């Protein structure tokens, strides 16, 4: 028997119990002891192996997005956008690409309820003919801060207090009181949208600004939008308490059960595009992740549909070991100078290497479905069998060559090295417009949630005053409403 023709299998098709090395086990119920009642012997390798494997079953959970659920399906192009991008998987209507999607909460632990007020992750991995494309977004279109330098501190503030492991409003409000750019995100998080009914009844967004490049090398900025065909549904406070109290995994179960019943969730993909030559024509910076692009002047363009029609086969292999990274793009899609995106390009891959090891892209859920070739090899948990003698490039013994060149954004970068903010902050206009677009009862719920948060006894008068000032600058009536319930005079 040639051992190299017999690869490790996930089928586990032996008719009897074995050790990891394949040795037969005749008793998987009893330890090896001295007599019927004697001490257990250390030589019971089967017991030692079984316990050692059990002790190492858990891997580090994601530092954010730990609680999640995945499903598989396909993406189908419905509208031609080849004038915008040379991406092969978007080449023509009718083209289908297999995908795996992971939905998640963001801040709380792996076993936390799915009814907490928290953004929801919406990450899509496209297995294209030109490699994988990871579109890693959320159910809300903007973010709290615009520069990734603040991201670790932001997560620390949102996470539980390190002293008592309790998430506390005073820490959150203290941190974000230094960053009025967060107001727009809070108009989503403290809105009814802050607690989706489940994963099927919410939209998704790429959040960051990317770039599309066509065959001629023309580049445009792009925002990605997923619109659910099931309609948006949310849970108000009393509903969330009831649902979460009955089943802390309700959204995971809803996704699984819906797909199992043939009720496949579906989203339509739209894009917004801006010519980089026109980026100075707006009262906001198109690369500012705390801003939305007004749809009345930058309309949504339809692209395709996402259908989830298959449940995952194994939660650990296809959810816990599933890894996304915004750096993973394909020809025709590229990054922008969005400061948060630039930070995520490094941070996500670095986090996955810590969590899963340097060869995490060899795991079946993360590996490309197309042919691939490079000299990245060895390292911890490398399980690809390779027998080549040439592991360098170039070589006259190996015919592998460079791929055909594909266009990337032609923009020229120049300027001084400096640490500074963007010029067009405009932190209050869009939050105010969003608040004024709501019905009165929705406005009241939003204000009440802020009053409740600011009523935390450890929130100081100074912090309350800062937030009332911020909301007054967004909308004077909102600031007055919050202040009146707190008996604090607006200071603007």
Swiss-Prot record:
Active site: 65, 138
Coiled-coil positions: none
Reaction equations catalysed: 2 H2O2 = O2 + 2 H2O
InterPro entries: Catalase, Catalase_AS, Catalase_clade1/3, Catalase_core, Catalase_haem_BS, Catalase_immune_responsive, Catalase_sf
Cellular compartments annotated: Peroxisome; Glyoxysome
Pfam families the record matches: Catalase, Catalase-rel
Names of the cofactor(s): heme
PROSITE patterns: CATALASE_1, CATALASE_2, CATALASE_3
GO biological process, any: response to hydrogen peroxide
Binding site for heme: 348
EC number: 1.11.1.6
Swiss-Prot/TrEMBL keywords: Glyoxysome, Heme, Hydrogen peroxide, Iron, Metal-binding, Oxidoreductase, Peroxidase, Peroxisome
Keyword Oxidoreductase in record: yes
Subunit structure, as described in the record: Homotetramer.
Matches recorded under PANTHER family: CATALASE, CATALASE-2
Function per UniProt: Occurs in almost all aerobically respiring organisms and serves to protect cells from the toxic effects of hydrogen peroxide.
Protein name, UniProt field: Catalase-4
Organism: Glycine max (Soybean)
């Amino acid at each position: 028997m040639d051992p190299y023709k017999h690869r490790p299998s996930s089928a586990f098709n032996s008719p009897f119990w074995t050790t990891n090395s394949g040795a037969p086990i005749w008793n998987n119920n009893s330890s090896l002891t001295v007599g019927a009642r004697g001490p257990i012997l250390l030589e019971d390798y089967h017991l030692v192996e079984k316990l050692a494997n059990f002790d190492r079953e858990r891997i580090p959970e994601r530092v954010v997005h730990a609680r999640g659920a995945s499903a598989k399906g396909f993406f189908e192009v419905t509208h031609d956008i080849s004038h915008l991008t040379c991406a092969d998987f978007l080449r023509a209507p009718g083209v289908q690409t297999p995908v795996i999607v992971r939905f998640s909460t963001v801040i709380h632990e792996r076993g936390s309820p799915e009814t907490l007020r928290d953004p929801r992750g919406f990450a899509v991995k496209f297995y294209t003919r030109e490699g994988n494309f990871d579109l890693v977004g959320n159910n809300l279109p903007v973010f709290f801060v615009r520069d990734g330098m603040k991201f670790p501190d932001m997560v620390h503030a949102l996470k539980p207090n390190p002293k008592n492991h309790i998430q506390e409003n005073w820490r959150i409000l203290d941190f974000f009181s230094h960053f009025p750019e967060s107001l727009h995100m809070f108009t989503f998080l403290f809105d009814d949208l802050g607690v989706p009914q489940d994963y099927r009844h919410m939209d998704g967004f790429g959040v960051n600004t990317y770039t599309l490049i066509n065959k001629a090398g023309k580049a445009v900025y792009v925002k990605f939008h997923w619109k659910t065909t099931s309609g948006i549904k949310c849970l108000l406070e009393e509903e969330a308490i009831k649902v979460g109290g009955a089943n802390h995994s309700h959204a995971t179960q809803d996704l699984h059960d819906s797909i199992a019943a043939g009720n496949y969730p579906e989203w339509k993909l739209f894009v917004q595009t801006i010519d980089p030559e026109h980026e100075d024509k707006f009262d906001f910076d198109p690369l500012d992740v705390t801003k939305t692009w007004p749809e009345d002047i930058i309309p949504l363009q339809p692209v395709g549909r996402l259908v989830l029609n298959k449940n995952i086969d194994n939660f650990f292999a296809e959810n816990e070991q599933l890894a996304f990274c915004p750096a993973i793009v394909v020809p025709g899609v590229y990054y922008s100078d969005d400061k948060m995106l630039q930070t995520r390009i490094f941070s996500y891959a670095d986090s996955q290497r810590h969590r899963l090891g340097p060869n995490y892209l060899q795991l079946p859920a993360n590996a490309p479905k197309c042919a691939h070739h490079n000299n990245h090899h060895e390292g911890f948990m490398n399980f690809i069998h390779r027998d080549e003698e040439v592991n360098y490039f170039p070589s006259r013994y190996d015919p592998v060559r460079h791929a055909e060149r594909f266009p990337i954004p032609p923009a020229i970068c120049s300027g001084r090295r400096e640490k500074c903010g963007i010029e067009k902050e405009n932190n209050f206009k869009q939050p105010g417009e969003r608040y004024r677009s709501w019905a009165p009862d929705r406005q009241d719920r939003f204000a009440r949630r802020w009053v409740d948060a600011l009523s935390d006894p450890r929130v100081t008068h100074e912090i309350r005053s800062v937030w009332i000032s911020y909301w007054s600058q967004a909308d004077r009536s909102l600031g007055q409403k919050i202040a009146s319930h707190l008996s604090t005079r607006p200071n603007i």
